[in-house]
Amino acid sequence: MSEPESSVANNDGESTQAPQLAELTLKNVLGDIVNGVHFIIFDPLGNRFVVPVIILLTSIITKVIITKVPYTEIDFVTYMQQIQLVNQGEIDYAEISGDTGPIVYPAGFVQIYQWLYSQTNGGADIATGQSIFGYLMTATVVFVCVAYTMSPTTKPWVLFLLLGSKRLYSIYVLRLFNDCFTTAAMVGVTVFLQQGSYWYSTSSFISFLFAIVGADLFSIAISIKMNALLYLPAVVIIAYFLVGENILLFAIVLAIVPLVQILVGWKFLLPLFDDEAASQIRWNYINNAFNFGRKFLFKWTVNWRFIGEETFLSDKFSILLMGGHIVVLLFFIFTRFLNSKVTGKSIWQLIKDAFKPSSTISSNNKLIDYNVGPKLILLILATTNVIGVLFSRSLHYQFLSWYCWQLPFLLHSTGWNFIVCLVLWGAHEWTWNVYPSTVASSLVLVGILSSVLVGTWRNEAVWFEENNVVDDEKKNE
């Protein structure tokens, strides 16, 4: 005999059938578990639950590592020795050095580490320094999650990869490298430029303000470590469109970058003095902090071990890398970043419009479309940076922090199968945990970075589609 169906009365007094609950069986319970797991791995709507978990786990993991894993001194003592000299009044970069060498970073680095100097009792209180870097890593993850979820089709598994790098935790809380602050600043730049894209349709002036703040923070990133310059082409392109292709507003945004450099480096640049001593101090600052000809030691390279030391140290190899960087970057710029399907107009029209004083941006420009613009901005910044990383003269172990935050998103942007992406992520992590690097590890690293860039370029859907429909991506799960 079947169970009678229950009924309830609605507001009009009419009887309606109550919804039937699924029968409590092992099969149904297992089905719910499978659906839940699928939701928090593949469904973009799951990000609202996954993001808080990612942030919480990052905070917990950093604290556990600080407690359980011994700190390793590499450069922090040297940083503190250099800062001590600055605090004592030394402003000549030629006279500022520590145990592992002279100061080689701009004035933003000095100001940040002066603050760390004050918080850690001159570097003696390492535990406090580690805690600060732990909070920095957690804050960086917060903003990375914001940047990722500004793209509505980012799947949760991409966010989970942010937890997966052993080397990255080491760079932050066991080494205390200044690269971490540059990375945090550039993640901030990404979010501000994404916000400029999102709000453009509401107010172009708000978008302009976000571009200003982004340029300010970009210059601060450069003042900490000049690897942030790798982003320059992307920042310039994005800023140009966020001000509506208005050349006058664009000039204002660009002017922010050198202005901030002057203000941050004021006491080392001595702009109000023109005597011989001031000129020498100014030159020493510029030459040490922004030395593009710096030589790297072969024993520390992570990416070029397979080419041999003689080739690595040769000027021809350096020129080859520079040429490759320029060619690949221009290829991406003209075939993807400035493609008419993105900008709404041809390259030739863009050039002609650039000489007009008023706004000339196309209404079809995807970079100012709140639906897809934030995703494209992250994509352009990430690919530009990773191209620079691929052709870097050398990658040292702390340099992983330059781009590790972007790799999960780029893997997702290739459109490759989920399992393939996980395997590549694992292989990439392996290359950074082999010490010292080997021929095999460096070959795999260069191969993965090259493959990800090729895969991202080939996936036209991620660049040109009006809206990425989640259902269309299920075949890649």
From Swiss-Prot:
Per the record, a Pfam family? Answer: ALG3
Protein's membrane topology: Multi-pass membrane protein
Q: Which UniProt keywords apply?
A: Endoplasmic reticulum, Glycosyltransferase, Membrane, Transferase, Transmembrane, Transmembrane helix
Could you say which residues form the signal peptide? Answer: none
Q: Where in or outside the cell is it found?
A: Endoplasmic reticulum membrane
- Record topological domains on the Lumenal side: 1-48, 153-172, 225, 271-316, 393-406, 455-477
Major location, coarse class?
Answer: endoplasmic reticulum
Would you name any one GO CC term?
endoplasmic reticulum membrane
One GO biological process term is: dolichol-linked oligosaccharide biosynthetic process
Q: Does the keyword Transferase apply?
A: yes
The EC category is: transferase
> Which pathway does the database say it acts in?
Protein modification; protein glycosylation
GO molecular function terms attached to this record? dol-P-Man:Man(5)GlcNAc(2)-PP-Dol alpha-1,3-mannosyltransferase activity
Q: Which ranges does the record mark as transmembrane? A: 49-69, 132-152, 173-193, 204-224, 226-243, 248-270, 317-337, 372-392, 407-427, 434-454
Q: Which residues lie on this side of the membrane: Cytoplasmic?
A: 70-131, 194-203, 244-247, 338-371, 428-433
Entry EC number(s): 2.4.1.258
Which Cys residues form disulphide pairs?
none
> What is the top-level taxon of the source organism?
Eukaryota
As its record notes, the protein acts as a catalyst of: an alpha-D-Man-(1->2)-alpha-D-Man-(1->2)-alpha-D-Man-(1->3)-[alpha-D-Man-(1->6)]-beta-D-Man-(1->4)-beta-D-GlcNAc-(1->4)-alpha-D-GlcNAc-diphospho-di-trans,poly-cis-dolichol + a di-trans,poly-cis-dolichyl beta-D-mannosyl phosphate = an alpha-D-Man-(1->2)-alpha-D-Man-(1->2)-alpha-D-Man-(1->3)-[alpha-D-Man-(1->3)-alpha-D-Man-(1->6)]-beta-D-Man-(1->4)-beta-D-GlcNAc-(1->4)-alpha-D-GlcNAc-diphospho-di-trans,poly-cis-dolichol + a di-trans,poly-cis-dolichyl phosphate + H(+)
For this chain, the family text in UniProt reads: Belongs to the glycosyltransferase ALG3 family.
- Function statement: Dol-P-Man:Man(5)GlcNAc(2)-PP-Dol alpha-1,3-mannosyltransferase that operates in the biosynthetic pathway of dolichol-linked oligosaccharides, the glycan precursors employed in protein asparagine (N)-glycosylation. The assembly of dolichol-linked oligosaccharides begins on the cytosolic side of the endoplasmic reticulum membrane and finishes in its lumen. The sequential addition of sugars to dolichol pyrophosphate produces dolichol-linked oligosaccharides containing fourteen sugars, including two GlcNAcs, nine mannoses and three glucoses.
> What's the protein called, per UniProt?
Dol-P-Man:Man(5)GlcNAc(2)-PP-Dol alpha-1,3-mannosyltransferase
**Organism expressing this protein natively:** Scheffersomyces stipitis (strain ATCC 58785 / CBS 6054 / NBRC 10063 / NRRL Y-11545)
